[in-house]
């Protein structure tokens, strides 16, 4: 008979901490954040420009997106093909990321090639050619992208929900990349003017993360220290505001399933309730066996998956329960959802809180295991106005969340009887059941993009 060794005890994970940056400033005022990460031989560079989307003119919204997407199409020194070949020679990848709060230009490159690659990176950001043919091509690509979104039920629902949750005059209510009526008005001259007016060293932060072969401050100074723009205009980020509660059904005749968004105006990461609401939303609709998924997917079989997520902005934000459901069960699914998201009689439990905290604290070392992960988080913090120790502080607050705190934070934000509803599906089969379920003021509309606005 075989003797088995006793199962070893599993020790709790050690407390992990986010890397601490070394700060410096270039001669032109650009803030520099350096993360020394031994063994990370692919450097990640994020140039964060404080250019919120409300800097765009209302009639040419989308100009920031077109400008950003055209940066690497050629510079004043190198045409597009030559620039692409030079980047490839250095083993570098160039990308952009645009949000309501600002713009990021991103470079990933082997440490041994950082010096030359960062020079090319600086060229793209500071002196792009923004040629007419490239701008016009990206305008057409953006218009095609919008047309494709109009054919996707899930994207229609997300666009319409955004338009309903935020007050209609605010930039947050409209797509980051602009809409057909505004994108079609973007010209090469408008793109050039936007770059000239808003790209510059003032308010800009360069984040470098990795295992550096040379002094990163000196490398950054050589590449970006001479950048000047005396005409640069700073724009204060607009604060979003909540829209009026609405119930919208966007008609897709014959659709066999419907996409649902049920939510409202939310909070940002600087709100003292953020850690508790993160735990609560994970328990309600973040985990695979969350309250929503356990009933609507596992027990009822109404959907392949449903989730609740909070999307913070620099100020405020939004939250939503979202999922796709078979047409014949949409009304019942929403009735069940409204019951489940009410926690007055079913507060969050210790087990739910423990599971959420274990997830958030356990995934952090993996999420930030690479230079890119660290630099991306640092860029997010810069755009949101968060301190350098935000991750560590956030994890400490998460560990202190109690069931009572999670329940109270959730109840203070999520008011089941005051939520905005957007459904994209077959109106002929859905309108009456939805009204009977508790949405009497349901508006039935056609999901043309122009109709996603309040």
Predicted features by range, described:
Residues 261-265, 284-325, 445:
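A structural supersecondary motif
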Residues 73-77, 107-141, 287, 311-368, ...:
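M16/insulysin-pitrilysin zinc metalloprotease superfamily fold
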Residues 1-14, 19-21, 205-210, 352, ...:
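C-terminal regions of mature proteins
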Residues 29, 47, 65-66, 87, ...:
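Buried hydrophobic packing residues in well-ordered domains
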Residues 143-159, 244-245, 249-251, 255-257, ...:
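Short acidic/His-enriched helical or mixed secondary-structure segments at domain edges of catalytic enzymes
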Residues 44-108, 174, 287-302:
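M16/MPP (pitrilysin/insulinase) zinc-metallopeptidase core fold and M16-derived inactive scaffolds
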Residues 2-3, 9, 84-194, 240, ...:
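Acidic/histidine-enriched segments that form metal/cofactor-coordinating
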Residues 2-16, 172, 176, 200-201, ...:
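An aromatic/glycine/proline-enriched structural segment found at the starts
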